[in-house]
Regions:
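A residue-level marker of the well-folded mature domains of exported/periplasmic proteins
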Residues: 1-142
Length: 142
């Protein structure tokens, strides 16, 4: 697959982490990383999943032990959007227009994955700064 080919090239050029954000093509990225760590168990290779927690996709058995090469996954919490929309429909009726889902209303996030507690604390701090408006994230390319 194209994902596997691209990942092989990146990993052969000493890239350790790939955030695939490529839909089904990402399966090839996971496959390549798992194959490489099966051959070289001491090598630290990671894949960052997209849209949902892809931890299950990152599992690989090495010498009878399960290892996971999924570092984390970015999450589109579409269930929260559907729940919010449904509640609004029932309580207020349908109102056309754009609705934004973001960190403040749990519309997006990340899976804990294999992130350290220290990393998660830093991420939570930045998340709160974004929610509070101390850090501005553009909603369109600049």
């Amino acid at each position: 697959s194209i994902g596997r080919t691209i990942a092989a090239t990146m990993y052969s050029n000493d890239i350790d982490v790939i955030f695939h954000a490529s839909g089904p093509t990402g399966n090839g990225v996971f496959s390549e990383a798992k194959d490489l760590v099966s051959i070289e168990p001491d090598r630290d290779l990671w894949v960052i999943g997209v849209d949902l927690d892809q931890s299950a996709e990152g599992e690989v058995d090495i010498d009878g032990e399960t290892r996971n090469i999924n570092l984390t996954s970015t999450l589109k919490n579409t269930g929260n959007a559907i729940h919010s929309f449904s509640n609004t429909m029932m309580e207020e009726g349908f109102e056309p227009g754009i609705q934004w889902f973001n960190l403040a209303n749990d519309g997006v996030g990340i899976a804990e994955g294999r992130l350290t507690d220290e990393s998660l604390e830093v991420i939570e701090d930045y998340k709160q700064q974004i929610i509070d408006g101390d850090i501005e994230v553009p909603d369109a390319p600049e």
